[in-house]
A protein has these predicted regions:
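Conserved phosphate/pyrophosphate-binding and hydrolysis machinery centered on Walker-type P-loop NTPases
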Residues: 65-69, 93, 135-136
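Walker A (P-loop) ATP-phosphate-binding motif of ABC ATPase nucleotide-binding domains
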Residues: 84
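Conserved P-loop
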Residues: 97-166
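Feature 3881 marks metal-assisted phosphotransfer/nuclease machinery
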Residues: 2-73, 77, 87
């Protein structure tokens, strides 16, 4: 835990000293003496900034989406503020949903034109191999793990096909990179 003096420096108006020796866009989680979460800050190269618990609303996902824990808060913040973000976590921790909600928010607000998704063309269990059966790249992609994830997150295949037709989502198999 940071000392009272360190916290005083971080929260002062002139907090331009990198007291935790952070890299640019590195986060610091601040807990109290009982190890309860208090705050999360990010070093922007000039000063520490508080990472607010933002709420995103998109046409694609409807209801406002808000982080459920500090790690999701940092993921949302990084996706909104950085050109590249890698999110890790166990299954069900919200990585895909947070990424898609943030990407759709950035598209709907005009900051991005489209989402480009590189996917592994390995099919899900008992689905056809990418190159062996007839069908478009999109049809084959929808049988892969990425297709199942997109259909689950967007609600149905029609919604995914619609975003692809509008050019808002582009699927590229890694074999074509």
């Amino acid at each position: 835990s940071p000392t009272d003096e360190e916290l005083s420096t971080v929260y002062s108006k002139d907090n331009c000293e990198n007291i935790f020796n952070c890299l640019i866009n590195e986060y610091v989680i601040i807990n109290d003496e009982n190890d309860n979460f208090c705050d999360v800050i990010r070093w922007n190269g000039v000063k520490y900034e508080t990472v607010w618990n933002k709420t995103l609303k998109t046409l694609a996902f409807g209801d406002k989406i808000k982080s459920k824990d500090v790690y999701q808060r940092m993921a949302f913040d990084s996706l909104l503020n950085n050109t590249m973000t890698c999110i890790t976590g166990h299954a069900g921790s919200g990585k895909s949903l947070i990424s898609l909600v943030t990407a759709m928010h950035l598209i709907e607000t005009g900051k991005y034109d489209k989402i480009v998704i590189l996917f592994n063309p390995c099919p899900v269990k008992e689905a056809s191999q990418m190159g062996y059966y007839q069908g478009s790249l999109i049809d084959k992609a929808m049988q892969s793990n990425i297709g199942n994830m997109l259909i689950t997150k967007f609600g149905d295949r029609f919604a995914v096909d619609n975003y692809i037709a509008q050019g808002k989502i582009k699927l590229i198999p890694m074999t074509e990179c």
